[in-house]
Amino acid sequence: MQGAGSRGAWIHSPSHCPGNGHGSPPAVAPQRRRLTRRPGYMRSTASPGIGFLSPAVGMPRPISAGLTGQEFYPSQSKARQCSLDLRSHCQDSLVGNPFLKGSLGPAVTSVGHLHPAQGSMRERMVHSGVHSGNDRRQSERLTGDSGCRQEFLSSDSSKSLASSLDVAWSKGSRGLKTVRPLVSPASNGPVDIPSLPGFQDTFTSNFSFIRLSLGAAGERGEAEGCLPSREAEPLHQSPQEMAAEGSGSDRPHGEPRHLWTFSLHAAPGLVDLAQGTRSNRQPECGMVSSSDAGFSSQDASPAGGRSDQDGGWADAHGWHALLREWEPMLQDYLLSNRRQLEVTSLILKLQKLQEKAVEDGDYDMAETLRQRLEDLEQEKGRLPWALPSQQPALRSFLGYLATQTHAALHGAPQRAGSDDPEAPLEGQRRTTAQDSLPGLAVTRRDWLMREKEQLQKEIEALRARVSVLEAKEQRLSQELEDQEMLLRWQGCDQMALVAQLSPGQLQEVSKALGETLTSARWAPFRVEPPETLRSLRERTKSLDLAVRELTEQVCSGEKLCSSLRKRLADLDTRLPALLEAKMLALSGSCFSTAKELAEEIWAVSSEREGLEMFLGRLLALSSRNTRRLGSVKEDYLRCRQDLALQEAAHKTRVKANTVKCTEVLEGQLSCCRCPLLERVWKADLEACQLLMQSLEIQEAGSSSHVEDEKQVHSTGEAAQTAALAVPRTPHPEEEKSPLQVLCEWNTYSASLPHCAAGLWKEESHVVFAEVGDKCEAIGMRLLHLEDQLLGAMHGHDEALFQSLQGELQMVKETLQTMFLQLQPAKEAGGEASASYSTAGAQEAED
């Protein structure tokens, strides 16, 4: 019997042992597949397949059909026949069970050699139930109503067999090998069952090339359609595991309870090979029961993870929920990348179009495309390409998920390495590390927040400590300075001088010195203003500077507006003359001259429009600056008032302290006769007197300055009023108003119709020039009045302010009068020029 190359294992019995006279022929299938022979050093003395031993002759057989007592097999042939019947029964009972092929290999070896025609049945996966109901059904299959029902196993041993298969299925799918002892019922006496040599002796070698050869032989057998034999298993086991397994299987021959060993060690290659047939025969084998759905992804086998029927992942709804949550964000990331691609493609197309437009000379199109390209480049810069998984939010979530996975992986070996073989498997087995991760995260967050709060408290404490230390350092510096001053006078020994004083004098000098040192702390010579007063002075100074700048801007704007108005007046003067000359040229059929005049008229009109637009903008700017100047002036005046009040209060305090110090010094001088102290106090008294004089001078100077300003403003106002009241004696011709000049000119030009147009043109220029000069003089006068108004506001001179307002009102009335006089002159000039033009045209027709 060549068990080394066989896919199934024999049912070993004493009749199969060498030297036994009652040997029976093995139950070999009629179509046995020819296998590759192995070298001699790779063969074992017997079949290496691990199978459960058949009961020996004389083993008690319990009767299940209500019979009592025990029966014994009369001969080895009967035992052999029953073993064959048991093999056929196991084949029939296992055909309908969806056992995993990778886990079935060793188990089928222990049951019996299957017929080759039943290869499809053998390749089906074994389904092992987890709960007690599945255990009962499996035990009924293994100890059913066949010829050998409960002949070798009692009901307890069959349940143990089912439990061992369950444990082997749940742990063999994770690559673990489980050896379960199955105890037969007790007999009347000990049964001597000889152990098989092939069962215990498994070929092992310490040479690496031999182990590689064994692995290669197993792979060849697997490639030919046969499952690898048990000899290849030492390649996947350590020497310690093999020694433990050998010692566990080596039982005494006289033991009444015999071991039936099942090894469900499924190789990864077999599991992958089983997937091909399982995916095709899954409807026949049936679905995994709902009790098995409790296995998580780390508990499932690799083949089960790639199954088409059970979905591949536990808790698929949770994963779908995560996908629904992150799908919009992923789409946003991808949309950004897609948009970047579109922008890049569009840039290339527009660049080609731009080159073509440049070649064709269409520079307008090229400029448009250039602007569009710039916009696209900016958009491309705002769309940086990046992997969605590298985005901060998703990357953080993936890191958290990796932490959960790591904890779950650490929890799986703890469940798989349980040493209790009788512990029941539960349908839903979750790792506690995964459940405790959210709690750990919350705990970690709370700890971090507490640490941050603690650090903030420590920082505040350190800051307070630093402020205390700084104050202490200042105090120590002052004391150190005092000590240094004392050390400077240690060389001068005054003991001889002091020893000459009487006790009364010593007491008097000591008291005077104490008062002097005490009064030095509140000496009035610290006349520096407080911090609030200094800051208010700085603010007042900055506001004064702002007022000056804004005033300069307003004045320059007014000057520019005046220049623009003058230029506009010149253009308004030129336009009627040009129109008149154009009409004359047309009436005289001088079309070339008329064309030139029309072009000049168009240029003048364009310039006038531009100047008007610029003047409007300048007026708006000047108005805004004026409003801003008004607000800044208000702030400046308010600060000036506050500054004056605080300075007055400060001077009052200094003056009061000076008076108090003077009184104290005078009292000390009258009661102390120490020459040194008397001289010191006299110097202090003189200093106080000087300070009082300084304060009085400052008060007198401020009052005199205000009076001088008032006098200056009043003098300037009187001079300006006199200048306005007594104007210069004009020329007799200048005394005429523009309207009078226009009327005289109309009377004079009535007798000269032919040269009226030219004369009127010259006279209009003269009139407008005179009026413009007068307007400019009035404008300058207005600027001067504005400066005077600012000075009056700064000096708080209400009288000067009122007089200047009256003068401004008078100047405004003068301007209004001149404007009213100028309007009829313009209308009269326009009518005269029109009449002259009509007269010239009629004369030309005649």
Curated annotation (Swiss-Prot):
UniProt tissue specificity: Expressed in brain, heart, kidney, liver and thymus. Within the brain expression is high in the cerebral cortex, hippocampus and olfactory bulb and is also seen at lower levels in the cerebellum (at protein level).
Span list, region Required for localization to punctate cytoplasmic foci: 429-587
GO biological process annotation, one example: cell proliferation in forebrain
Coiled-coil stretches: 440-489
Membrane-spanning intervals of the chain: none
InterPro entries documented for this protein: DISC1
Quaternary structure and interacting proteins, as annotated: Interacts with NDEL1. Interacts with CCDC88A (via C-terminus); the interaction is direct. Interacts with GSK3B. Interacts with tubulin alpha, ACTN2, ANKHD1, ATF4, ATF5, CEP63, EIF3S3, MAP1A, NDEL1, PAFAH1B1, RANBP9, SPTBN4, SYNE1 and TRAF3IP1. Interaction with microtubules may be mediated in part by TRAF3IP1. Interacts (via C-terminal) with PCNT. Interacts with CHCHD6. Interacts with CCDC141. Interacts with FBXW7, the substrate-recognition component of a SCF (SKP1-CUL1-F-box protein) E3 ubiquitin-protein ligase complex; the interaction targets DISC1 for proteasomal degradation.
Protein name: Disrupted in schizophrenia 1 homolog
Organism name: Rattus norvegicus (Rat)
Organism lineage: Eukaryota, Metazoa, Chordata, Craniata, Vertebrata
